[in-house]
Amino acid sequence: LARVAQTQTLKLGYREDAQPFSFKGADGKPAGYSVSLCQKVAASLQSQLQLSKLDVQWVPVTAGSRMQAVTDGSVDVECGSTTRTLGREQQVDFSNTIWVEGASFVTLASASMNRVADLNGKRVGVIAGTTTDSALKSLSARGVVPVFVPIQTHTEGIAAVRTGKVDAYATDRLILVGEVLGRPSDVALKLSEDYLSIEPYALMMRRDADLRLAVNRALAQTYRSGEIIEVFRQSFPAGARPSALVEATYVLNALSE
């Protein structure tokens, strides 16, 4: 936080392919739910630090590079779709929860795959090192053993399903919704109703208690004021409503000063 104050610069990491949380919009600029929250955070930090100006620099990261980008200082805060885990907290800090999601999988609409058990023996694309990767590997305890196919990006994963390279692609459910709805194709896909895991999303940042507190103060204000509802409406399709878990997240993290 001291570096941000001294340089009057905030480096925010974003994903180019994690719709609807963090992606490159049609105008080439960062967009999405997490990006909007980080814009709220940036405005709050400028006020908290009493800066006349704050230069916000957006830095693209991937699922594979985001942790390193945070730990080596390339970005101060990562505004993506990152799941908070105790293992990751050994290396980085996290904000309070901003979303609660679950991992699922997508297949061709014509495929006879609907339940988690149907993944047994099937080629399943997944980004290595993610929480979805861990969830899939844990299925062996239930007698479900997929054939893992390494994928680099969500866009690549969806394309692999459509071209038949994999039988299914697994990642966080809402990202799959964004990818399927946001990228029309002649090849119809379907999303499983089963969940592989429950994923609490948070903003990832360098190990800095002062920065974490400042970010959480910004988020709490956004929740308390009701501004989070407008962020939600701008980020998701018309008529969409937060799940009960997400609504609880807003209430529980609307902390008072």
For the regions a protein language model found, what residue spans apply to each?
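Extracytoplasmic small-molecule ligand-binding "clamshell" domains
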Residues: 1-78
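Beta->alpha turn/N-cap motifs
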Residues: 14-18, 59-64, 73-85, 109, ...
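Periplasmic-binding protein-like
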Residues: 16, 99-110, 155, 173-174, ...
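Ligand-binding cleft/hinge of the Venus flytrap
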Residues: 27, 39-55, 132-150, 180-185
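Extended ligand-binding regions for polar small-molecule ligands
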Residues: 32-44, 110, 117, 121-123, ...
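Short helix-initiation/N-cap motifs at beta->coil->alpha
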Residues: 51-68, 111-112, 148-159, 199
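A ligand-binding cleft/hinge motif common to bilobed small-molecule-binding domains
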Residues: 64-65, 79-91, 135-140, 160-197, ...
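Short beta-strand-centered segments that line the small-molecule binding cleft or hinge
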Residues: 66-81, 88-102
